[in-house]
């Protein structure tokens, strides 16, 4: 498996998800206006693109949500196949969509730059997008969140690790633990990580996270992890290793305190490890677990 295989799989997924958005068991998708591109939002060393969706009914001090696409997707495509626009209109949320220029439209989750606080990679540009939105719309700095699918899910975990002071919570769909995909190169493919062969203790994973922001001693964002049990793109061990990583950060022992069947929906089981960590296991679901916007925003405390 290489990025080319991942891109091919996600291109097919994009078509299927777009078709499903026309009419499925979820609330009917209502077409929203297009995103607005922001050209100058601060330091942007890797040349990523920023797009905004700002509802007309914006309250004072709105929440800000960073949304990150999968490989082979664009910001506009992801926006058009999710309900985030509808929910932003209903609840007064500023949506920030990033878009990477990397080959295959995959986020850099593997280089030293992106895995270092203000290190000059994709993560630096994304952090500055969020800061721009906070300043421009007087956003509430205590209600800043990040979510994404696949490559965007990997970057979601990276952002939570590299910029823990910026985000209150994260929700990722079919990603990898922060730092698992490290190669030292931009957009490097880590076969060991993708194949489920990178296995560490909770303490080792926690040290990996803390090394991304040396000297930081504050809280880390609450984490919600989705993964499917027949994922052949990113091994199902990714779920267990992600749970270990964030259990190590939060001081949990990795044993669920509560197990909820068919929650938040059919074929899903929710494991609650503490008030700062949830894992949601998709039975018979491959890559990726479809974005559940309502569940993510509920985890964020917006709904």
Give the residues covered by each predicted segment.
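Short beta-strand/loop motif that positions the catalytic acidic residue
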Residues: 225-227
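Alpha/beta-hydrolase fold nucleophile elbow
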Residues: 138-150
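Short glycine-enriched nucleophile-adjacent loop
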Residues: 153-165, 171
């Amino acid at each position: 498996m290489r990025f080319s295989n991942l891109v091919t799989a996600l291109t097919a997924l994009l078509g299927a998800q777009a078709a499903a958005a026309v009419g499925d068991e979820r609330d009917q998708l209502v077409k929203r206006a297009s995103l607005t591109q922001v050209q100058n939002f601060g330091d942007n060393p890797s040349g990523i693109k920023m797009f905004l969706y700002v509802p007309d009914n914006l309250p004072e001090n709105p929440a800000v949500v960073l949304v990150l696409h999968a490989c082979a997707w664009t910001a506009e495509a992801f926006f058009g196949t999710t309900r985030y626009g509808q929910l932003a209109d209903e609840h007064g949320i500023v949506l920030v969509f990033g878009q990477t220029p990397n080959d295959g439209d995959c986020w850099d989750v593997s280089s030293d730059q992106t895995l270092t606080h203000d290190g000059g990679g994709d993560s630096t540009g994304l952090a500055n997008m969020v800061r721009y939105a906070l300043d421009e719309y007087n956003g509430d700095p205590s209600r800043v969140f990040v979510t994404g699918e696949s490559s965007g899910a990997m970057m979601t975990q990276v952002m939570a690790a590299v910029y823990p002071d910026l985000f209150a919570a994260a929700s990722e769909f079919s990603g990898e633990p922060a730092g698992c995909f490290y190669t030292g190169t931009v957009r490097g493919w880590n076969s060991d990580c993708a194949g489920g062969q990178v296995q560490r203790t909770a303490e080792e994973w926690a040290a990996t996270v803390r090394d991304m922001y040396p000297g930081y001693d504050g809280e880390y964002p609450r984490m919600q992890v989705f993964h499917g049990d027949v994922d052949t793109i990113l091994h199902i061990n990714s779920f267990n290793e992600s749970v270990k990583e964030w259990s190590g950060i939060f001081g949990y022992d990795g044993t669920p305190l509560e197990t909820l069947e068919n929650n938040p929906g059919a074929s899903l089981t929710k494991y609650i490890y503490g008030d700062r960590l949830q894992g949601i296991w998709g039975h018979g679901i491959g890559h990726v677990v479809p974005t559940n916007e309502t569940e993510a925003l509920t985890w964020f405390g917006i709904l």
